[in-house]
UniProtKB/Swiss-Prot annotation:
Source species: Xylella fastidiosa (strain M12)
One Gene Ontology term from the biological process aspect of the record: translation
One GO cellular component, as annotated: ribosome
UniProt entry tagged with the keyword Cytoplasm: no
Keyword line: Ribonucleoprotein, Ribosomal protein, RNA-binding, rRNA-binding
Entries under Pfam families matching the protein: Ribosomal_S11 (PF00411)
UniProt-recorded name of the protein: Small ribosomal subunit protein uS11
Length: 130
């Protein structure tokens, strides 16, 4: 019988990150929550669709709340205490995602709206006729 060899692997050390940035992209169809460190390296992300909501339920404020809670609880292992929140988009899950991040236990330092606003740039698409 062959001798079994035991391979020692290095244990991965988790970094300690005290403050980070929560990027909330709230579109009309979905809400994406990404939590990064200060340099922009992604630590965890979650969407309304990945949280189990499908179809028209993805774009509700409750789905955004569940996605933000899921992302916030996953990053607690890094030792994160405070978050800067950057909100992008006009969707219905904007405020509820920020509120649920503060309910998880993070100290929110500032909230920035980074939605791009054109200074009369491209022509918008034509109006829908239903």
């Amino acid at each position: 019988m062959a001798k079994q060899s035991v391979v020692k692997t290095k244990k991965r050390v988790k970094r300690v990150i005290t403050d980070g940035v929560a990027h909330i992209c709230a579109s009309f169809n979905n809400t994406i929550v990404t939590i990064t460190d200060r340099q922009g390296n992604s630590l965890f992300w979650c969407t309304s669709g990945a949280s189990g909501f499908r179809g028209s339920r993805k774009c509700t404020p409750f789905a955004a709340q569940v996605a933000a809670e899921k992302a916030g609880r996953a990053v607690l292992d890094y030792g994160m205490k405070s978050l800067e929140v950057r909100i992008n988009g006009p969707g219905p899950g904007r405020e509820s995602a920020v509120r649920s991040l503060s309910n998880v236990g993070y100290k929110i330092t500032n909230i920035i709206d980074v939605t791009p606003i054109p200074h009369n740039g491209c022509r918008p698409p034509k109006k829908r006729r239903v």
